[in-house]
Amino acid sequence: GALKINGKVTDWYNPNLTSAQMVKKNNNDDYTDKLLSDAVSWYKSKYNDDCTQYDNNKDGYIDGVFLIYSAYDFATGEELGKTLDENLFWAYTTMDYNAESNLKSPNGGYYFWASYDFLYEGYGTDKVDSHTFVHETGHMLSLTDYYSYTTKDKNGYNIYSPMGGVDMMDYNICEQDCYSKFVLGWNEPYYVDKEGEITINSAATSLDSI
């Protein structure tokens, strides 16, 4: 594939807080920034790693952290009769803008926050499903959501969706589309300067597109 991600899956980091306590500390919607900082510090100490290998552009920040929490996401919790804060216990990608750059021991900056349960929300299967994680990784690569945050119907559902929902950056369906692949530099255009024949292969199995 065009993208190869290298990293490390750690043991669970325990902040010694219940989900209710985390909600109380999240008054300014930035407590996950502190969790990121604490978790990165814990990682450096536990694994004796300065994290320079995860700073490919040498800006003093880890290129990306997947911060996965063990609590239910709020929607799953709702199905099980548990009330969880929807602003905190959901999936999103953000940046700790207060983190300081450190070239010798890079700190966490850009990260996504998502529940472990998202791995099992698949389409009629009990197997591991990575759609939400792929969607959030798209954000980490600079892609935006391909739907409107503000145009909703009376039930609160998005009604403006140029991709019709059928896209990874829209409704977490399929894969990254041809436009996204082009924006990310995964495919290259043909420069036609003379008569000839070009074979366009399937976009699902190649990087070709029109």
Which role does the model predict for each range below?
Residues 1-104:
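Active-site-proximal segments of metallohydrolase catalytic domains
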Residues 64, 70-210:
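Extracellular hydrolytic enzyme modules, especially secreted metalloproteases
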